[in-house]
Swiss-Prot record:
The lineage of its organism: Bacteria, Bacillati, Actinomycetota, Actinomycetes, Kitasatosporales. Monomer. This is Alditol oxidase. The keyword Nucleotidyltransferase does not apply. Its cofactor is FAD. The modification Pros-8alpha-FAD histidine is found at H46. Belongs to the oxygen-dependent FAD-linked oxidoreductase family. Optimum pH is 7.5. Is stable in the pH range from 5.5 to 10.5. It comes from Streptomyces sp. (strain IKD472 / FERM P-14339). FAD binds at S106, S111, G114, T118, G119, T120, H121, V169, R319, H369.
């Protein structure tokens, strides 16, 4: 009999023949070795599609019971983090040692391993995705053996943003830097017309633009400045006079400190407080990453269909990402602008809009976030990743029987 487990948003039901929550790496390796096929790992469940669905005959591996390892080496400035650890937990430990991650995503409650495996990112023209600091990957492969992959090896380009296709990540080693403080400055009513996107995007260490596409412009700008940088000069919009939430009408107390008040990096780079624990999300999410040189044209394309987009949209966030070296990284090989859409939780209403949005953006070579809602065909995805053939070969090398290849991955790799 299959067991049903839902994701965080509740829009996907994972049907698995078995669900295991191993408590040790040895127990995990034993479960993997005994599994016939369809082994998929999940920790925080923050994906919005079937990327982690093993199917009715497969095995779902929940990693949240594994030891919450966060071993900091202050001399090497690295941290070894277990496969089930979330960023909020990791950040507190790292900061206590006087060190920092270079960037974080908007939500600190997501797992480290799942985030880097799907290409998740924060913002900043000089900041790479969350996979960028990874310096070693530890995997349990199909036969239950442990494999370590580090930079300099031919396999490393496919090992971090791996979509779960190579094995189950038991630990990652990440590079760190000295701890720093950040002030978060919010502005309102930034016009789209006449926007100098490059200047705006580079105005802070991390910059996010928010709109609901009901008007041609941005209702909010979140500018995060390291305190060792100059105060932001941002004459294009008005400073916010009240605390804000990215979604209009939502309580701002859930968000990290605003008004430029300096604070530790891990309490400012995310948009949401770690102590605010979200329950199942009343939302769906999509995101498209495309060359930053096309940012204004892409925004104009969305603006032209805003009457279609706005009725099912909660908020849209525009961010930037530096180029990524991972073969399946959505910002692989290019300076990137990322257009993120938080939809209402109504799949039937949202999917037609997603299709229309993808048509509007198609000319700009968009790559959808691997873990969010999209309708882009597997054939189109293969054409947008020049190293996908190398990744396919690596997956077959480490998992020759396809034990970790579910329907989502089979369509992508074997089509």
């Amino acid at each position: 009999m299959s067991t049903a487990v839902t994701n965080w948003a509740g829009n996907i039901t994972y049907t698995a023949k078995e669900v295991h929550r191993p408590a040790t790496a040895e127990e995990l390796a034993d479960v993997v070795a005994r599994s016939a096929w369809g082994a998929c790992a999940g920790a925080a469940g923050h994906s919005f599609n079937e990327i982690a669905d093993p199917g009715p005959d497969g095995v779902l591996l929940r990693l949240d019971a594994l030891p919450a390892e966060t071993d900091v080496d202050t001399t090497a400035r690295t941290v070894r983090v277990g496969g089930g650890v979330r960023y909020a937990e990791l950040a507190r430990v790292v900061h206590a040692h006087g060190l920092a991650l270079p960037n974080m995503a908007s939500l600190p409650h997501i797992s480290v391993a799942g985030s880097v495996a799907t290409g998740t990112h924060g913002s900043g023209v000089t900041n790479g995705p969350l996979a960028a600091p990874v310096r070693e990957v530890e995997l349990v492969t199909a036969d239950g053996s442990q494999v370590r992959i580090a930079p300099g090896e031919r396999r490393f380009g496919g090992a971090v943003t791996s979509l779960g296709a190579l094995g189950v990540v038991t630990a990652l080693t990440l590079d760190l830097e000295p701890a720093f403080e950040v002030g978060q400055h919010l502005f309102t009513e930034l016009p789209l017309r006449g926007l100098d996107f490059e200047t705006v995007a580079a105005a802070g260490y991390s910059v996010s633009l928010f709109t609901d596409w009901r008007e041609p412009g941005f209702r909010q700008v979140w500018l995060k400045r390291r305190t060792d940088q100059e105060l932001p000069d941002f004459p294009w919009a008005r400073p916010a006079t009240v605390a804000l939430h990215p979604v209009p009408g939502m309580p701002a107390e859930n968000c990290t400190q605003q008004f430029g008040v300096p604070g530790p990096w891990h309490e400012r780079l995310p948009h949401f407080r770690a102590e605010f624990t979200p329950s199942s999300g009343a939302e769906l999410q999509s995101e498209y990453l495309l060359p930053r040189a096309h940012a204004l044209d892409a925004l104009d394309a969305v603006d032209r269909i805003r009457d279609t987009v706005a009725p099912v949209l909660q908020t849209c966030e525009v961010r930037t990402v530096a180029p990524d070296e991972q073969w399946l990284g959505p910002s692989h090989g290019r300076d990137t602008v990322a257009l993120h859409f938080t939809w209402v939780k109504d799949t039937e209403a949202v999917l037609p809009v997603v299709r229309r949005l993808e048509e509007a953006l198609d000319a700009f070579d968009p790559r959808p976030h691997w873990g969010k809602v999209f309708t882009t065909s597997a054939a189109a995805l293969r054409a947008r990743y020049p190293r996908l053939a190398d990744f396919r070969a690596l997956a077959r090398e480490l998992d020759p029987s396809g034990k970790f290849t579910n329907t989502f991955l089979r369509d992508l790799l074997d089509g």
